[in-house]
Structure formats: structure tokens, C-alpha cells
Amino acid sequence: MNFQGLVLTDNCKNQWVVGPLIGKGGFGSIYTTNDNNYVVKIEPKANGSLFTEQAFYTRVLKPSVIEEWKKSHHISHVGVITCKAFGLYKSINTEYRFLVINRLGVDLDAVIRANNNRLPKRSVMLVGIEILNTIQFMHEQGYSHGNIKASNIVLDQMDKNKLYLVDYGLVSKFMSNGEHVPFIRNPNKMDNGTLEFTPIDSHKGYVVSRRGDLETLGYCMIRWLGGILPWTKIAETKNCALVSATKQKYVNNTTTLLMTSLQYAPRELLQYITMVNSLTYFEEPNYDKFRHILMQGAYY
């Protein structure tokens, strides 16, 4: 359905005129609105992922919580966005859910494609630090992102040095009342996410924990450097079991993973991925140590 021209009424009774379609993904379509600072994200209510996003926005991504966390951690920017409003729209046959969220600029995937499918090492390390800061914030609220990839990392419209990790349709609550979720497989959760970057735990049906997000970021950084992961071509065939098995094969062979993907083994990525692979499912990572590794790669 094309929503352009429709007037949507949100939960606060404000009205939004839907403009042209500017993006479409696995978790909804994105349109401009009559306010240039915001876009509207729409999907059928029955799909459920936008409800997951809405809940995450309203429970976790409160401006006061974000600002307090930044102050307490002495971090100037956290790449999460907030939700301006939400609501439901009913057509003749289908009910839709919509969110009104911040309008951003181009995504990192477009930037990489415009640069011959690779970024300089310094840029990759700096992006890695920004995403590490962002997932640390999410993790300390008890949630994992579950779908880190270049197309879900978006530049600020005005300040190109600010990045945002968006699309919260696969966030998972791994911590509740101070207790980590148990290490129990759920067949309905197997292979969630983007197959090429899905963490091994998710392949097996476990809730993505902190180590899963860090694992995915490691795979992404290899790709951003221009590497081709050993399972990239397999992922295109949608053979989930073979992708999972191939990832598992490299868990204790990080040097081989990097040499196969990049034809060289950047010291910082070797350290980063080795440290990720040493984490247990329940373990809280030493984010400062990970940050230090990436800083070394960016500045030395």
C-alpha cells in the first residue's frame, strides 16, 4: 500500500501528512512527513516488529535516561534515536502501526558502496567505537540490538561525524530485574537477524546477549575494511545451517578468519575478535578494554 498523501493521527492527536517513500526494509517502510525533522515508519500491525520497536522506544530510549547515561560515562554521543509519537491506521482490509521518529541522513552502507566497498582502517575503528558506545548503553539497559549492520547505521543529517544505530525490531531483553536470561534454546528464534552477520548464539536459537552484539560488530568491521567473510557467498544462498557451521569453524581460528577474509590480519581486529570469543554467554564485557583496542587502531 502507498501511504503518500494520507493524514495519520498519532497517540497525542497530532496529525502527520505522509510524504514520499524514502526507504523500505524487513521491518517496515519509511516515508517523509510534513515536518522535515521526522519520518514515519509503517508496517502491518500483525507483523509485530514495530510493536517491539515501540516498546523499546517508550521503555528505554527516554531522553532523560540517555542524557544521564552520557554524563555518568563521560561519553558525548550515544547513537540511539527517540520516538516522537506513534499510532495505528486502519485501511479497508488491514490495520497498520506507525512510529514517528527522527529523520537522519544516509546510511553507512551507501557511504561504503560509494567508496569502492571499503573504508580506511581509521574510519572503521572510529565507527566501531561509536557503535560500541551505543551497544554498551543498550546493554546496560538490559537489551541487545540483534541486527548490527551498515544499513542500520545512519549518519546525522547535519553532523556527519555523528552515527546512529537504528532499527530496533530485533532487540532482545537479556536481563530482567538483574537476572540474565537462561541459556535455553528457542527454535522459533533460530537464525534471527541478517544471516551474514548473525551471531552464533542466534543461529542456535539463544537470545542474543552482550557477546552476540560484539561478535556481529567484529564481522561488520571485517566487511567495512573491504573483506569478504568465508560465509558471505553461502549467506546469499540462505543456507542457515552451513553459515552457522562455517562461523563455528573459525571461532578458535581468528588469524585464519582474518587472512581468509582480508589477506592480512589487522592486530586490533585480531585482539578484538579473540577477546569476543573468550566471553561467556552471561559475561559482562570490559567495554573499556574493547574501546582501547579500537582506539589503538584508529590513532596509532
UniProtKB/Swiss-Prot annotation:
Required co-factors: Mg(2+)
Family: Belongs to the protein kinase superfamily. Ser/Thr protein kinase family. Poxviruses subfamily.
Induction details: Expressed in the early phase of the viral replicative cycle.
Identification of the protein by name: B1 kinase
InterPro entries named among the record's database cross-references: CK1_Ser-Thr_kinase, Kinase-like_dom_sf, Prot_kinase_dom
UniProt-annotated catalytic positions: 147
Protein kinase domain span: 16-282
Subunit structure: Interacts with host JIP1; this interaction increases the amount of MAPK bound to JIP1 and subsequently increases the activity of transcription factors, such as JUN, that respond to these complexes. Interacts with protein OPG198; this interaction inhibits the repressive activity of OPG198 pseudokinase on viral replication factory formation.
Catalytic activity: L-seryl-[protein] + ATP = O-phospho-L-seryl-[protein] + ADP + H(+); L-threonyl-[protein] + ATP = O-phospho-L-threonyl-[protein] + ADP + H(+)
Keywords from the UniProt entry: ATP-binding, Early protein, Host cytoplasm, Host-virus interaction, Kinase, Magnesium, Nucleotide-binding, Phosphoprotein, Serine/threonine-protein kinase, Transferase, Viral release from host cell, Virion
Ligand binding (ATP): 22-30, 45
Gene Ontology cellular component terms for the protein in this record: host cell cytoplasm; virion component
The keyword Phosphoprotein is assigned to this record: yes
Subcellular location, principal: virion
Organism (species): Variola virus (isolate Human/India/Ind3/1967)
